[in-house]
Amino acid sequence: MFRDLKPAYLFCCSVLYAFSVLRPSQGISVSTHHNLHKTVGSDVTLYCGFWSNEYVSDLTTLSWRFRPDNSRDIISIFHYGNGVPYIEKWGQFRGRVEWVGDISKHDGSIVIRNLDYIDNGTFTCDVKNPPDVVGTSSDVHLTVYDKIPPVGAGVVSGAIIGTFLGIILLIVGGLYLFRYIVRRRARSETSFLQRRRSAAERGKVSGKAGTVSKGPVLYATLDQSKSGKGASEKKSKLSESKRDKK
């Protein structure tokens, strides 16, 4: 039984050893712009950046290819290998391509000068950095115009809609602010009038209380004056009776 399991055991050990010692190739990532718009006679920089787990060496290769619009033909316009850039010396890009990248900085950019209508198409950047050889290339589409590229209908409609919505928001905000100010003023005026009314009512109540309290005082004063007159009359009568007796 154990003899039958020995080959399977050896196979598993060999697989584990291979995974632990041998490092599989990693995928390389390449990035470019998506769309570029230029005018006739101008220059364009085709950016190509890449990322790899491996160090850049002389084994690193980079290439640029071009496919014109409405065509399936693919034209090689640039190649980098063994640490040296190679620019194609024939075809429509002859004398117009310049290497401006730096492989050590993961930059594979080129410049195409004096653009023309025949340069409309898709440019593809492909990078290999062994053992990172698995990955996808990146494309950038170039459109060459006679003048400044016109603004798209979508951009114009978006700007109009955005402006219209902004005006509506400003109007609504202004109305809410106006209503808030009016309500605040009305509340302040109402509270002021209420304070005045309460003050007037308090003044009336205090005036009535003063008139009511003066009644007993007046009656007491009258009583005192009457009692004083009666006492003086009694005294005068007593003095007259004494005189008559004498």
Curated annotation (Swiss-Prot):
Function text: Creation of an extracellular membrane face which guides the wrapping process and ultimately compacts adjacent lamellae.
One BP annotation, GO: myelination
Secretion signal, residue range per the UniProt entry: 1-27
Region described as Disordered: 200-246
Stretches assigned to the Extracellular side: 28-150
Glycosylation sites: N120
Regions crossing the membrane: 151-178
GO cellular component: plasma membrane
Reported tissue expression: Found only in peripheral nervous system Schwann cells.
Paired cysteines (S-S): C48-C125
PROSITE patterns found in the cross-reference section: IG_LIKE, MYELIN_P0
Residue ranges of every copy of the Ig-like V-type domain listed in the record: 28-143
The keyword Ligase appears for this protein: no
Protein family membership: Belongs to the myelin P0 protein family.
Organism this protein belongs to: Heterodontus francisci (Horn shark)
Superkingdom as given in the UniProt entry: Eukaryota
Residues in compartment: Cytoplasmic: 179-246
Keyword Glycoprotein found: yes
A UniProt-annotated Pfam family: V-set
Protein name per the record: Myelin protein P0
